[in-house]
Regions:
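C-terminal capping region of solenoid repeat domains
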Residues: 1-5, 11-13, 155-190
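LRR N-terminal entry segment and analogous cap-like coil->beta motifs
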Residues: 1-65
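Short, solvent-exposed loop/turn at the beta-strand->alpha-helix junction
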Residues: 5-10, 31-38, 58-65, 85-92, ...
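Compositionally biased, intrinsically disordered low-complexity segments
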Residues: 17, 35, 62, 67, ...
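Leucine-rich repeat
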Residues: 17-24, 45-51, 71-78, 98-105, ...
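Concave beta-strand-loop units of leucine-rich repeat
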Residues: 25-31, 54-58, 81-85, 108-112, ...
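C-terminal per-repeat helix/turn "cap" of leucine-rich repeat
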Residues: 39-45, 66-72, 93-99, 120-126, ...
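Eukaryotic tandem repeat interaction scaffolds
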Residues: 77-125
Length: 190
């Protein structure tokens, strides 16, 4: 297996960073890349995983597609993919994968997500339990912002961060006034 940036194999990283009786795995800044996602997605030790932190790991759409196809990681409630290289295809994989039906928190801050990725989230029947969505510092634009505001499935959201997405003032008002965000307690637009 390829060794990540910190020169430890993924097997060792999992052993060292798996916590809370196997429910939390924190691999932030380990640079496991898409190759590490292969092992992670098929590791039987992770069958009880509920929280997965993968910030800054050089993960692309390919790695997310591998994760979305996992038959082991089906109980994840919180997924942090902050500061990777995930685009619309990767987000579409998350939005369509039954493995993510329990997600309540999805952090995609500072990736490469455009309006199609935001639309995939907005249209997802899988992500109806989401309470927290962070899409800050992506490129969803007005079309992506409107799609989220018009979503019939994201009604459980309590926190949404869309800062730094090139969303116009007009679309920001549409988002603020969305009746679909009836449970929203915190909205970040600028």
């Amino acid at each position: 297996m390829n060794r990540p940036f910190n020169d430890q194999p993924i097997e060792t990283l999992i052993d060292q960073n798996l916590a809370n009786e196997g429910t939390v795995l924190d691999l932030r800044l380990k640079y496991i890349s898409d190759d590490g996602m292969e092992f992670l997605s098929s590791c039987p030790k992770l069958v009880s995983l509920q929280e997965l932190k993968l910030e800054r790991n050089d993960i692309t759409d390919k790695g997310i597609q591998i994760l979305a196809g996992s038959t082991i990681l089906t109980g994840i409630k919180s997924l942090n993919l902050e500061r990777n290289s995930i685009g619309d295809e990767g987000v579409r994989s998350i939005a369509l994968s039954p493995s993510f039906s329990r997600l309540t928190s999805l952090n995609l801050w500072k990736n490469e997500i455009g309006s199609d990725g935001a639309k995939a989230i907005a249209d997802s029947l899988i992500l109806g339990n989401l309470q927290r969505l962070d899409l800050a510092k992506n490129k969803i634009g007005d079309d992506g912002g409107k799609a989220l505001a018009e979503s019939q499935t994201l009604t459980s959201l309590k926190y949404v961060d869309l800062f730094g997405n090139g969303i116009s003032q007009e679309t920001q008002e549409i988002i603020k006034e969305s009746l679909n965000f009836k449970n929203l307690q915190h909205l970040v637009l600028e």
